[in-house]
Amino acid sequence: MSIVEEKVKTIIAEQLGVKQEEVVNHASFVDDLGADSLDTVELVMALEEEFDIEIPDEEAEKITTVQAAIDFIHTNQK
C-alpha cells in the first residue's frame, strides 16, 4: 500500500467514522460507508487540506469510491 493510499484511507475512516478495515478500495462512500452529501463535502475538504491540492466541484462529484479518491490524488498531487 502506498503512502498516499494509506493516508487517504485513514482520512476516510476518520471523516466517516468507520473502521479502517471497512475502507477498502472498491467501497462507495455513500452505498458502502454510509456517507451523506455533507460527509462527502467534508471528506473532499480534508483530502484537499492533507495533500495541498484543489479538487474542483465537477471532479469532486466523480470521486465516489475510495479508489477514485486515491487515483485523483496520485494524478494531481504536486
Swiss-Prot record:
Presence of keyword Coiled coil: no
Subcellular location: Cytoplasm
Similarity comment: family membership: Belongs to the acyl carrier protein (ACP) family.
Pathway: Lipid metabolism; fatty acid biosynthesis
Main location class: cytoplasm
Signal sequence region: none
One of the record's GO molecular function terms: phosphopantetheine binding
Protein's name according to its UniProt entry: Acyl carrier protein
Keywords: Cytoplasm, Fatty acid biosynthesis, Fatty acid metabolism, Lipid biosynthesis, Lipid metabolism, Phosphopantetheine, Phosphoprotein
CC annotations in GO: cytosol; membrane
Record's comment on post-translational modification: 4'-phosphopantetheine is transferred from CoA to a specific serine of apo-ACP by AcpS. This modification is essential for activity because fatty acids are bound in thioester linkage to the sulfhydryl of the prosthetic group.
Organism: Blochmanniella floridana
Biological processes per GO annotation: lipid A biosynthetic process
Keyword Membrane tagged: no
Positions where O-(pantetheine 4'-phosphoryl)serine occurs in the chain: S37
Pfam family, any one: PP-binding
Occurrences of domain Carrier (ranges): 2-77
